[in-house]
A protein has these predicted regions:
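Bacterial N-terminal signal peptides that target proteins for export
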Residues: 1-8
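Bacterial N-terminal signal peptides
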Residues: 8-18
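Short, low-complexity N-terminal intrinsically disordered segments enriched in polar/charged residues
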Residues: 19-60, 64, 160-173
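Short beta-strand edge/turn micro-motifs at domain boundaries
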Residues: 21-27, 132-160
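A solvent-exposed, acidic/Ser-Thr-rich amphipathic alpha-helical stretch
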Residues: 40, 57-110
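Short, structured motif recognition centered on aromatic/hydrophobic residues
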Residues: 49, 101, 114-118, 138-139, ...
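Hydrophobic/aromatic beta-strand elements that line small-molecule binding cavities or substrate pockets
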Residues: 86, 90, 103-108, 119-123, ...
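A short, structured loop/turn motif at beta-sheet edges
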Residues: 106-114, 126-128, 140-146
Length: 173
């Protein structure tokens, strides 16, 4: 559990450095964009990606929205690189299997071509919730100007503590 939190923290630091602009002593000419407009566009892309998963299924949507080669997916049990590898586990998704998420915040670079969104996700099988947690998705504009996922990481919430029912004598059971 701790290594994944450390990995997520490291990604946030890298993103913060990337979004802070050029380093001291580096002469980089970047036309500044409105970071809020960039973030709004990335949040909209994230919502459209979630809608595509609901409409087209995870495999088709992941192939369409993840960058074909420069993308990575990290969760507690896997590290996958490239859209094909990331979409492959969804090849035979059983009926009733769904993944959904809602972005709630993010940050964007001043260059206007990179942003990270984060929010809550849920994985379900029919009415049964299999996993919920937080996700972080990093987006980069491709050569055509379309937003593509380059990094996606999830951290599941810890399981709820077991509930106990007192016995008739009032002792915890």
């Amino acid at each position: 559990k701790a290594p994944y939190r450390a990995a997520l923290a490291a990604m946030i630091v890298v993103l913060a450095v990337a979004c802070s602009g050029p380093s001291v002593g580096v002469d980089v000419k970047v036309e500044a964009k409105d970071p809020q407009a960039t973030l709004d566009a990335a949040l909209q892309a994230d919502r459209e990606f979630a809608a595509a998963v609901a409409k087209d299924g995870p495999k088709a949507a992941f192939l369409a929205w993840f960058h074909p080669t420069d993308s990575q997916f990290i969760d507690a049990g896997s590290y996958l690189k490239g859209a094909e590898a990331i979409a492959a586990p969804f090849e035979q998704s059983p009926p009733g299997f769904t993944i959904g998420w809602v972005p709630d915040s993010g940050v964007a670079s001043p260059s206007g071509d990179f942003a990270t969104t984060t929010g809550r996700f849920a994985v379900k099988m029919g009415d049964q919730t299999l996993q919920v947690g937080r996700y972080m998705t990093s987006w980069r504009k491709d050569e055509a100007g379309a937003w593509k996922v380059v990094m996606d990481a999830t951290i599941a919430d810890p399981p709820a503590p077991p509930t106990t029912t007192p016995d008739p004598d009032g002792r915890p059971g």
